[in-house]
Amino acid sequence: MFNEILKKVDWHGNMLSLSTGKIARNADGAVLASMGNTSVLCTVVFDKNTKKDIDFFPLGVYYREMAYAAGKIPGGFIKKEGKFSEYEVLVSRLIDRSIRPLFDSNFRNDTQVICTVMSYDPRYSPDILAIIGSSAALAISGIPIVKPIGAARVGIVNDEFILNPVIHDNTGVNELDLVVAATFDSVTMIEAQACEIDEEKMLAAIEFGYKSLKPVINAIEEIKSSIRKDIFEVTARPHLRYNDEILKHFSSDIKSALLLQTKNERNQQLQLIQQKVVDYFSSEANDDDAILNIEKALDDVKSKIFRDLVLQDKTRIGNRAIDEIRPIICEAGLFNTVHGSALFTRGDTQSLATITLGSSTDEQIVEQLNKCERQNFLLDYIFLPYSVGEISPLRAASRREIGHGWLAKKAIQLVIPSKDVFPYTIRIVSEITQSDGSSSMATVCSASLSLMEAGVPIKTHVAGIAMGLVLGEGNKFEILSDISGCEDHLGDMDFKVASTKNGITALQLDIKVQGINLSMIESTFRQAKIGINHILNVMNNTISCPKSELSTYAPMVQTLEIQKEKIRDVIGLGGKVIKELCKTFDVEIDISENGEVKVWGNVGENVKKAVQSIENIVFVPQIGDIFDGEVVKVIESGAFIKYVTGRDGFVHISEINDTHIKDINAHVKLGDKVKVKIIGIDHKNRVKLTLRTDKEHCKNKNEQYNDITTTTGSVKKKIKIAPKEAAVISNRKYFD
């Protein structure tokens, strides 16, 4: 019944299978890509009617993780998959950026790629399979693509390159997470996060991944040959006939406009030129389609003039040199009540970054198929419409904003201190207040500056730069440093590089041509390093090390360690004790299973008092210790005295004073403040107290114990803490 075609390939020790003809047969292309027990169904459908009223390729890519793939039922009130998670959006963009360069430049048909994770094996990540499956589905769909691609993940473990490293392999620390997509002869996409990898090693990793793809691409070609579907015919767009006329009459004006230094000046002049061009062809510009074709022809001419400037005159838009960085202005500490802030301006691109420090309760809980984790470092990128002088509604984060934010986060992640060193939750918000290209890399720079201004102990600055490419005939090309928005639009590449002074922390490559070779990547790295060093120098001149103190508006935290068996005493029955502490001192208390206690609060004095109260609760009482206590209950045979927070002891009527007492109520009343001494502890740890304290004995005890005095409400207590029960609090020793 099914005419299934199945290809299996041994890919560096892992069996990759590609199957088509069994599932989703109404799609133009459908491939089930599997490795281990991970399977991803990739489908492609395109509209057979070409859109004539647009000048872009309408491609939509959607990656979806179904809970059933991991044997789960979605959590929450509604037990089904909801909106796309950030991870799903990021993988969707990863696929899109890998396959978009493959399409014919004249193809303008609505195209949709859907990748669904059908089965999940924790050892194998489905994102690589989604890229491979999408490439295979496109190859058999009838869509005119240049050539199929493969994709691979590369890691570095024990200084060796690993292809598609197993996710939960604990044989060593992975210094690199690199994804490479490529055809037989060129690279189409790169995405990477690294631990300060030098440029030479990164290039070798890219080459390793690129050269590993041959078996995958061969398998896709074999499936394509087996199906032999007719290829959809694409016709050249009619705007091409306007090009020569525009070039002849307006090239000088266009060149002069492109050389203007500011974005606003250029845009104003180019808009005037556009109107002149439309007026020149007024006899033909009688409908929207004709105007669109004329505008597209003008865009082609701008691209040609831009390329001639770069390749022949060795200059570029804004009259800059090929490797020239736009003027940079850095400023740190703009707002007093914000925990940290910085403004980074590069040319007409500007990012305003702010830092907020929070407690462990502010951590982001992220649930994926394979894990549920808490993230204490958050970075949000917000692209504001006024940054490009436009009006648009403010909505939830777009796919582009999510992608740019995650790229900046990956670039900064390496320098963020561990929770052991800096226990705060860190949230960075980067608001793009001006934009003329490379706003994600401006975010990296502003985030790094704001972290130091906030006093977060990062070890060094991270800077980012966007590199461009202009291809000429033959092997001729030029690499551009710090591209503007117009250069991104007219050029062939947007290669974002983030790095410290020691090495690369993040990469992202997008291209508009069919691919680039390793020589171009090497040249990009070499030129990017020079640019990044320049940017780092400017940043270090503004602020070169973290502030020694946090903002007075930031929450304070103190950490102490208690014995595991004492955790229940701090929590209390039904959480009574910990709730009382939080309410009394207006703090948050976080207790881990290993006995680490963190106390958070906005008022430092309250945090210290809460810590002292916890110390009082967990201390080990010793016979002879003397305390200031409070009568909390009186019965016929004696009284119960609260001698520390959460601790009561019993005073028998015979221990009230040295005389015989007939009526205890005549001597002690509820709420009385009394001095008590421990005279006994039974096998159930019940404490027996006496009011008949010996002053001389008290003096001797003060020589053996350290005093800590704390106030809870109107109760003042002096606590005797034995030296052998030492606890470390914020690098200072107290005694428990």
UniProtKB/Swiss-Prot annotation:
Top enzyme category: transferase
Ranges of residues in domain KH: 555-614
Subcellular compartments: Cytoplasm
Domain S1 motif, chain residue ranges per copy: 624-692
Cellular component terms per the entry's GO annotation: cytosol
Gene3D superfamilies: GHMP Kinase, N-terminal domain, K Homology domain, type 1, Nucleic acid-binding proteins
InterPro entries per UniProt: ExoRNase_PH_dom1, ExoRNase_PH_dom2, ExoRNase_PH_dom2_sf, KH_dom, KH_dom_type_1, KH_dom_type_1_sf, NA-bd_OB-fold, PNPase
Top-level division of the source organism's lineage: Bacteria
Catalytic activity: RNA(n+1) + phosphate = RNA(n) + a ribonucleoside 5'-diphosphate
Necessary cofactors: Mg(2+)
Any single GO BP term: mRNA catabolic process
EC number per UniProt: 2.7.7.8
Keyword set, alphabetical order: Cytoplasm, Magnesium, Metal-binding, Nucleotidyltransferase, RNA-binding, Transferase
Binding site for Mg(2+): D488, D494
GO terms of molecular function: 3'-5'-RNA exonuclease activity; magnesium ion binding; polyribonucleotide nucleotidyltransferase activity; RNA binding
Family of the protein in this entry: Belongs to the polyribonucleotide nucleotidyltransferase family.
The protein's role, per its UniProt record: Involved in mRNA degradation. Catalyzes the phosphorolysis of single-stranded polyribonucleotides processively in the 3'- to 5'-direction.
Protein's UniProt name: Polyribonucleotide nucleotidyltransferase
Gene source species: Orientia tsutsugamushi (strain Ikeda)
Taxonomic classification: Bacteria, Pseudomonadati, Pseudomonadota, Alphaproteobacteria, Rickettsiales
Gene designation per UniProt: pnp
